[in-house]
Amino acid sequence: MPTPSMEDYIEQIYILIEEKGYARVSDIAEALSVHPSSVTKMVQKLDKDEYLVYEKYRGLVLTAKGKKIGKRLVYRHELLEQFMRIIGVDEENIYHDVEGIEHHLSWNAIDRIGDLVQYFQEDPKRIETLRNIQKRNEQAEE
């Protein structure tokens, strides 16, 4: 199992490859706000653990294992962002909140959150009911 830090790198590499067709050390460093030397060390570790193949000065490619995990990590992140929007978290807090919790949830919890997101999406009236409850609670706090 990858560590939370490894997950961040795999997720970002997956996103870069999906968007640009490639992922360079400099692109990864910029996206994660870390030094290129840190990226190189992590990429070497990910290569050793067979999440990707890295050739110095030639770039990197995710292995089947890396692609599978990368896809699942992106799904987890996007699902948690959807969940935060549904439950009414302020947009400016969503990314930071998701980054704070995504590594601490089991895949079972992620699957159950997915069920809940689906439940709300299948009937928009459910979201409307939730918003009404939130408004009532906010008014009661005033």
UniProtKB/Swiss-Prot annotation:
Central regulator of manganese homeostasis. PANTHER family: IRON (METAL) DEPENDENT REPRESSOR, DTXR FAMILY, TRANSCRIPTIONAL REGULATOR MNTR. GO terms for biological process: intracellular manganese ion homeostasis. Homodimer. DNA binding is strongly activated by Mn(2+). One of its GO terms (molecular function) is DNA-binding transcription factor activity. It comes from the Bacteria. One of its GO terms (cellular component) is cytoplasm. The keyword Manganese applies. PROSITE patterns: HTH_DTXR. SUPFAM superfamilies: Iron-dependent repressor protein, dimerization domain, Winged helix' DNA-binding domain. Keywords: Activator, Cytoplasm, DNA-binding, Manganese, Metal-binding, Repressor, Transcription, Transcription regulation. This is HTH-type transcriptional regulator MntR. It is found in: Cytoplasm. The keyword DNA-binding applies. Mn(2+) 1 binds at residues 8, 99, 102-103. The lineage of its organism: Bacteria, Bacillati, Bacillota, Bacilli, Bacillales. Belongs to the DtxR/MntR family. InterPro entries: DtxR_MntR_Metal-Reg, Fe_dep_repressor, Fe_dep_repressor_sf, HTH_DTXR, HTH_tscrpt_reg_MntR, Iron_dep_repressor, WH-like_DNA-bd_sf, WH_DNA-bd_sf. Mn(2+) 2 binds at residues 11, 77, 99, 102. It holds the Pfam family Fe_dep_repr_C. Residues 1-63 form the HTH dtxR-type domain.
